[in-house]
Amino acid sequence: FSSRRRHTRSFHVTGVQTCALPISLSELTHKRRLSALGPGGLSRDRAGFDVRDVHESHYGRICPVETPEGPNIGLIGALATYGRINDYGFIETPYRTVRKTATVSASTDPATLVGRMLTSDTRRRLPAPVQERASSTALASLTSVVAGEMVPVTQEIAAELVALARAEGEFELSVRPYVTGPEDPRFVGDVKYLPADEEEAFHIAQANTVLDDNGNLIESRVASRYDGEFQSAPVDRVDLLDVSPKQIVSVAAALIPFLEHDDANRALMGANMQRQAVPLLTPEAPYVATGVERQVARDSGQVVLSKASGEVLSSTATEIVVLGDDGESHRHTLRKFIRSNQGTCINQRPIVSRGDRVVEGQPLADSMSTEGGELALGQNVLCAFMFWEGGNFEDAILLSERLVQEDKFTSIHIEKYEVEARDTKLGPEEITRDIPNVGEEALRNLDDSGIIYVGAEVRAGDILVGKITPKGESPMTPEEKLLRAIFGEKASDVRDTSLRVPPGVQ
């Protein structure tokens, strides 16, 4: 990564790649990939350890876990879960604003003040006219509050504060640091996106900082970051709060249960290997999950979502029709048995029935790697860690035959094979069923044109398309000339270049 400032690194997008579509996760992670290679970037041959290592500016922006294991390690990264790109091309990460005062005005709803914690400094920091009036109200009890003690705002105190604001005008009430909740109208505005260089001036607490039911920070000291360093700071210094513990990692890493207990090297392998899963015949959502699975499935674009709220008019294997509340019919076409770029089978299955009530954005059909609108990469199987007469020596495992009989890990792949008939110096190639030195048994699945029938079952070595190519002729004996004149035998001047099933394919 090229250095912009001491605490920032830049990335850029180069070239066009074929999208990875085997499963929802691989498509999503491919679209969120970052690269430091290419024109204007680094070279993998000359990139040292320093530019590959995790940097403090990566926090909440580039995942420290998900990266390739080969020569591109550290040069190819992944966007963190909540990271986004600003107008100038730099990565930003969100933080929650920690409020240290509460605005009290004549129009303030007293209920919004209930639950805030008043401290020994609250009365001292009030404007002088408000302090004088407060001495004859419920706030007079604050004079006896000792340092470190907190008094919760009750309905009575909240009403007195609003009454003071009506008499003396709007004022700021010093309270225990707190963050707003999702039900607060200020919540969205309190979420700030910052690039790496701007966050250096703030004390930022971790997402696991202890909060009470009203969002107050109740500990006197909290673990925080300031100017790129981790430290323990008094709660009064905290300016921002992480939005989530998973904001430092990518989507793939956030799918690993109990990630905090994993060794970093094994977590890297797990995040990369999840993308390599192939879609199964019967996807099954995991029993042990992290809560990100449903959002990953939606954001991948492979799950069909309802265009409007309404009632399902029809639900078939190829189309779902929803009658919206606006009276219009909304058609949702499903993708059936389409080959992906990696040769896997793209297939969408309806999960709603006729007459069901749906809302806008609700999943209507699963993809090949989801179940019930939730990411499903594998199967829930019962595992035992035990000895079994040496059958599981070292890295060997024993499997129940039910896994095979019930097609638990069976997948469908669609391969595309092409053949071309070219004009050569010795003459044109020909697609034909008349192939020299090939028995009738090998031609049984070919039509008159030499092309395999649709639905034929083939194995490795079977002919898919018959093709012959001219070859240089050698002098023929009189017997060969006679046979060629009588039977039209071409064995002497053509060779078999038919397209056959590759080894290992059935």
Give short role names for the model-derived ranges.
Residues 4-5, 9, 16-506:
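Intrinsically disordered, low-complexity regulatory segments
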